[in-house]
Amino acid sequence: MTQMTDAKSGITTEEMKFVAKEEGMDVETLKNLIAKGYVVIPKNVNRNTKPVGIGDNLRTKVNVNLGTSPDFIDIACELKKVEISNKYGADAIMDLSTGGNLPEIRKEIIKNTNLPIGTVPIYEVGVDAKEKYGRVIDMDEDLIFNVIERQAKEGVDFMTLHCGITKQTVSALNNDPRKMGVVSRGGAFLTAYIMYHDKENPLYKEFDYLLELLKEHDVTLSLGDGMRPGCLQDNTDRAQIQELITLGELVDKCREKGVQVMVEGPGHVPYNNIEANMKIQKTLCKNAPFYVLGPIVTDLAPGYDHITAAIGGTLAAVSGANFLCYVTPAEHVRLMKEDDVKEGLIASKIAAQAADVAKGHPVAWKLEKEMADARIKHDWERQFEIALDSNKPRKMREEIPSKDEKACSVCGDYCALLMVEELGKR
């Protein structure tokens, strides 16, 4: 049984009750959205995961990527990133490790959080294939599905799998060349496999078998966008849309089998094209939850891509995206450090909150009202408690204090609020 099959059967699970309470939503309404495939609750049956709802009519959720690379392997560092994710309100974590003992790293990450955990299994497949055969492109079907099954048994809650990379998608790419080609790592692995062996993508060819594996453990399938644009010039091209058409067809198959599914999206997109991208996805994929990376709205800000992504993420979420993958200041430059994780997470949560306010979500507006109440009362401690990051504003206030404990050092004696209050007392 999965959350989706239960919902279709009219069964109300404990996870549904929890999510409905968190969202301020009637559980029957939520159950109907899950049954239709408009909402997912990524929760592997083998793991005690905190239930998190992702999809239409819910708050916008934020994911944190972390993990090792061949150039930097430090489990302790990754666990600090997990700790930061827990502390600053991430809704999910993805382990994208490609260096070191991948199963051991994943085990430690899972042990140190109750947030939903996602992976990209093709990364481990590529690492294993290189160790076993000497080249990533020599991976085979058995290796691919063995890794997926092993991760499902370990408790991974959702998996990014690039099932839409097909011979037809690769043909669209070749017929309409890009500035930057394929920038998705998993997408590149499978594109290279197809081109070198002239074989179909096993994840597409054996999609029904894949669904059997995922359904057994109620792993949510996150259909990866292997043809996402890697620069603004490549946005919304034929390869991207061809893959999206295929993903829409695969969404139908998932729903028929009762497998929870969401769809991933771009990427690098000019601000004026973001809304159109969201509408196209929601139409082609029939309102499946949409999970976007950014989108980044300019390529000129390495070192500041948490900002470019937050700008794009706000509009994306207002226009239909349900799940934002954070982007850190280190994007396009190096592996993220702990401080990068915090900066990226807070920036993405700002985008999510701004979008939820624009969409009129009651939970988002409740928080805004509480902040306004705290400010009018000059209740600084309450303001810090409500803030997305309590530590930074508290520290900043201590650095340059005001003589008046109700005011801040910007205005001091000339505080507008205090001045009007004083007049009101007369």
Curated annotation (Swiss-Prot):
Its cofactor is [4Fe-4S] cluster. The keyword Iron-sulfur applies. InterPro entries: ThiC, ThiC/Bza_core_dom, ThiC/BzaA/B. GO terms for biological process: thiamine biosynthetic process; thiamine diphosphate biosynthetic process. Keywords: 4Fe-4S, Iron, Iron-sulfur, Lyase, Metal-binding, S-adenosyl-L-methionine, Thiamine biosynthesis, Zinc. Zn(2+) binds at residues 268, 332. It is an enzyme of class 4 (lyase). Binds 1 [4Fe-4S] cluster per subunit. The cluster is coordinated with 3 cysteines and an exchangeable S-adenosyl-L-methionine. Its EC number is 4.1.99.17. Substrate binds at residues 65, 94, 123, 162, 184-186, 225-228, 264, 291. [4Fe-4S] cluster binds at residues 408, 411, 415. Pathway: Cofactor biosynthesis; thiamine diphosphate biosynthesis. One of its GO terms (molecular function) is 4 iron, 4 sulfur cluster binding. HAMAP family: ThiC. Belongs to the ThiC family. Catalyzes the synthesis of the hydroxymethylpyrimidine phosphate (HMP-P) moiety of thiamine from aminoimidazole ribotide (AIR) in a radical S-adenosyl-L-methionine (SAM)-dependent reaction. This is Phosphomethylpyrimidine synthase. It comes from Methanococcus maripaludis (strain DSM 14266 / JCM 13030 / NBRC 101832 / S2 / LL).
